[in-house]
């Protein structure tokens, strides 16, 4: 079970807002990640076929890359790799814009974190139901 992961007690807090004055970053735990630059595409207006975001360490670490996935239809509650050798995976719940991240640190330790990514969708240009979405803060 995901919740039995050893890292749950040390779950990493996330910050989805870019304006830290109105929403301070929590620095509890071993790692702090900032999620920004969320984007996605809904070709039929109801599901994503592409989404991504930037993830950056805010604790002095070197983590700073774009995590993304593409498919004919990205499924809610399914884990997607952030990329080769990243040791990070994500799952997205489109109905609540919820992001779940996990980072495999070792065979015994997995860090887990969650956040909500508010976003705005507009016409995408590839038909009446095509939408392009981007994060808002």
Curated annotation (Swiss-Prot):
<keyword id="KW-1015">Disulfide bond</keyword>
<dbReference type="Pfam" id="PF16541">
    <property type="entry name" value="AltA1"/>
</dbReference>
<dbReference type="InterPro" id="IPR032382">
    <property type="entry name" value="AltA1"/>
</dbReference>
<keyword id="KW-0964">Secreted</keyword>
<protein>
    <recommendedName>
        <fullName>Allergen Ulo b 1</fullName>
    </recommendedName>
</protein>
<feature type="signal peptide">
    <location>
        <begin position="1"/>
        <end position="11"/>
    </location>
</feature>
<dbReference type="GO" id="GO:0005576">
    <property type="term" value="C:extracellular region"/>
</dbReference>
<comment type="similarity">
    <text>Belongs to the ALTA1 family.</text>
</comment>
<feature type="domain" description="AA1-like">
    <location>
        <begin position="28"/>
        <end position="137"/>
    </location>
</feature>
<feature type="disulfide bond">
    <location>
        <begin position="121"/>
        <end position="133"/>
    </location>
</feature>
<comment type="subunit">
    <text>Homodimer; disulfide-linked.</text>
</comment>
<feature type="disulfide bond">
    <location>
        <begin position="67"/>
        <end position="82"/>
    </location>
</feature>
<keyword id="KW-0020">Allergen</keyword>
<keyword id="KW-0732">Signal</keyword>
């Amino acid at each position: 079970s995901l919740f039995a992961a050893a890292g749950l007690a040390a779950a990493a807090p996330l910050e989805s807002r870019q304006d830290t004055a109105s929403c301070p970053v929590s620095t509890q735990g071993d790692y702090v990640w900032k999620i920004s630059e969320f984007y996605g595409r809904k070709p039929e207006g109801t599901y994503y076929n592409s989404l991504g975001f930037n993830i950056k360490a805010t604790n002095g670490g070197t983590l700073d890359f774009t995590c993304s996935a593409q498919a004919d239809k990205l499924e809610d509650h399914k884990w997607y790799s952030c990329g080769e050798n990243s040791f990070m995976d994500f799952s997205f719940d489109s109905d609540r814009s919820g992001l779940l991240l996990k980072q495999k640190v070792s065979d015994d330790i997995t860090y887990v974190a969650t956040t909500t990514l508010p976003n705005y969708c507009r016409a995408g240009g590839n038909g009446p139901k095509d939408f392009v979405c981007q994060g808002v803060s």
